[in-house]
């Protein structure tokens, strides 16, 4: 599970690095050139302007609608991720048995544990990395959305609810973003593994800190996206993907645990 935490940290670092590598002060419009601007940033900017005009100039509502459209676009991938999470939960009893069998910390035993674990995954057709693919796809979308927000001059200093869209909200919105991130991850938690519990608390804190310094419109994207994921998880798999009863209901190796 350390690998998943490392990947999450790496992706966030890449996001921040790439954010600094592009000129976020250059306005985005139909004349913008380059693959990044033409096919990633400008379409999102155009959508925000289109929906803002439809909502009497409200870019806050436009951001919410665009966020929901993005979530609907990647919904098939997220459903696949949820199914993969469910399958991983069903394998937890066998994985725990392997960890107990190969509990020694020497290199040879740990290699044997890894081999047996991979064989278990192959036996049941489970891809342990399947849950990472939606994250990889979301990162460029999030970066493009950040650029669209920063470079769409029409947004300006518009107020939405209690915050200004192109400025950070120092307290309330970041807290909401952190809480919804926690709830979303809690519902998708597969196991009581201590390392996963660390990730459960670290990611919301990271989102909270980022939301304190990034434009409120991006934090709004996180909040709406998290709420969508919470509802999606609830209606597709129930209130807790990691509930112990899941393992009892899913067939593993042709037998019910």
From Swiss-Prot:
It is found in: Cell membrane. It comes from the Bacteria. A lipid is attached at residue 21 (S-diacylglycerol cysteine). The keyword Chaperone applies. The chain crosses the membrane at residues 35-55, 59-79, 129-149, 160-180, 205-225. It is a multi-pass membrane protein. Residues 1-20 form the signal peptide. One of its GO terms (molecular function) is membrane insertase activity. NCBIfam families: PRK02944.1, yidC_oxa1_cterm. Belongs to the OXA1/ALB3/YidC family. Type 2 subfamily. PANTHER family: CYTOCHROME C OXIDASE ASSEMBLY PROTEIN COX18, MITOCHONDRIAL (PTHR12428:SF65), OXA1 (PTHR12428). HAMAP family: YidC_type2. This is Membrane protein insertase YidC 1. It comes from Halalkalibacterium halodurans (strain ATCC BAA-125 / DSM 18197 / FERM 7344 / JCM 9153 / C-125) (Bacillus halodurans).
């Amino acid at each position: 599970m350390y690998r998943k935490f490392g990947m999450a940290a790496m992706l966030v670092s890449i996001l921040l690095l790439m954010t600094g590598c592009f000129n976020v002060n250059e306005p985005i419009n139909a004349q913008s050139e380059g693959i990044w601007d033409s096919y990633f940033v400008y379409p999102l900017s155009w959508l925000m302007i289109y929906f803002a005009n439809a909502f009497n100039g409200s870019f806050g509502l436009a951001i919410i609608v665009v966020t929901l459209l993005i979530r609907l676009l990647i919904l098939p991938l997220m459903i696949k991720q949820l199914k993969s999470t469910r399958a991983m939960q069903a394998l937890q009893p066998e994985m725990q048995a392997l960890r107990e069998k190969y509990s020694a910390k020497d290199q040879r035993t740990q290699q044997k544990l890894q081999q047996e674990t991979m064989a278990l995954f192959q036996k049941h057709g489970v891809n342990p990395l399947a849950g990472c693919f939606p994250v990889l796809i979301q990162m460029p979308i999030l970066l493009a959305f950040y650029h669209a927000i920063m470079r769409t001059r029409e947004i300006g200093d518009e107020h939405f609810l209690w915050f200004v869209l192109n400025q950070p909200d120092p307290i309330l919105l970041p807290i909401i973003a952190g809480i919804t991130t926690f709830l979303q991850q809690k519902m998708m938690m597969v196991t009581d593994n201590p390392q996963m519990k660390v990730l459960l608390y670290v990611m919301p804190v990271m989102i909270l800190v980022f939301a304190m310094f990034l434009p409120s419109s991006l934090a709004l994207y996180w909040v709406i996206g998290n709420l969508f994921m919470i509802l999606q998880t609830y209606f597709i798999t129930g209130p807790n993907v990691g509930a112990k009863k899941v393992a009892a209901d899913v067939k593993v190796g042709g037998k019910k645990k």
